[in-house]
Amino acid sequence: MSSFIDITNVISSHVEANLPAVSAENVQSLANGAGIAYLGKYIGTGITMLAAGAVGLMQGFSTANAVQAVARNPEAQPKILSTMIVGLALAEAVAIYALIVSILIIFVA
């Protein structure tokens, strides 16, 4: 539990350090609606990267279940391993697509 809290503190301090300072120009752009687009861009990127986090979680579950299956039936290890690697590669493709979409949202939109 403490490692999760440490990770959250590191992330929040990194976000706070990289946020632009509030100035009169930033407040005026918020009033003009440009700030809402700016905010929406980063919220959309965060939502997109939730897919990458979910992929990481599911890859962990997949690997754990494959290890349990091999422990129960060591003779089936080659088939289980090959099936697991194909499944992990397909899942990793989703995470890569999410990363590409996030980069496009940040730099193109």
Curated annotation (Swiss-Prot):
Subunit-structure text: F-type ATPases have 2 components, F(1) - the catalytic core - and F(0) - the membrane proton channel. F(1) has five subunits: alpha(3), beta(3), gamma(1), delta(1), epsilon(1). F(0) has three main subunits: a(1), b(2) and c(10-14). The alpha and beta chains form an alternating ring which encloses part of the gamma chain. F(1) is attached to F(0) by a central stalk formed by the gamma and epsilon chains, while a peripheral stalk is formed by the delta and b chains.
Q: How does it sit in the membrane?
A: Multi-pass membrane protein
* Keyword DNA-binding found: no
Its Gene Ontology cellular component terms are: plasma membrane; proton-transporting ATP synthase complex; proton-transporting two-sector ATPase complex, proton-transporting domain
Which residues does this entry assign to the site Reversibly protonated during proton transport?
A: 92
Q: What is this protein called?
A: ATP synthase subunit c
Gene3D superfamilies documented for this protein: F1F0 ATP synthase subunit C
Matching entries from PROSITE patterns are given as: ATPASE_C (PS00605)
Pfam families named among the record's database cross-references: ATP-synt_C (PF00137)
Q: What does this protein do?
A: F(1)F(0) ATP synthase produces ATP from ADP in the presence of a proton or sodium gradient. F-type ATPases consist of two structural domains, F(1) containing the extramembraneous catalytic core and F(0) containing the membrane proton channel, linked together by a central stalk and a peripheral stalk. During catalysis, ATP synthesis in the catalytic domain of F(1) is coupled via a rotary mechanism of the central stalk subunits to proton translocation. Key component of the F(0) channel; it plays a direct role in translocation across the membrane. A homomeric c-ring of between 10-14 subunits forms the central stalk rotor element with the F(1) delta and epsilon subunits.
Which keywords does UniProt give here? ATP synthesis, Cell membrane, CF(0), Hydrogen ion transport, Ion transport, Lipid-binding, Membrane, Transmembrane, Transmembrane helix, Transport
Instruction: Indicate the family of this protein.
Output: Belongs to the ATPase C chain family.
Q: Where in the cell is it found?
A: Cell membrane
The GO molecular function terms of this record are: lipid binding; proton-transporting ATP synthase activity, rotational mechanism
For whether the record's keyword set contains DNA-binding, the answer is no
Domain of life of the native organism: Bacteria
Q: Write out the transmembrane intervals.
A: 42-62, 88-108
**Species this chain originates from:** Ureaplasma urealyticum serovar 10 (strain ATCC 33699 / Western)
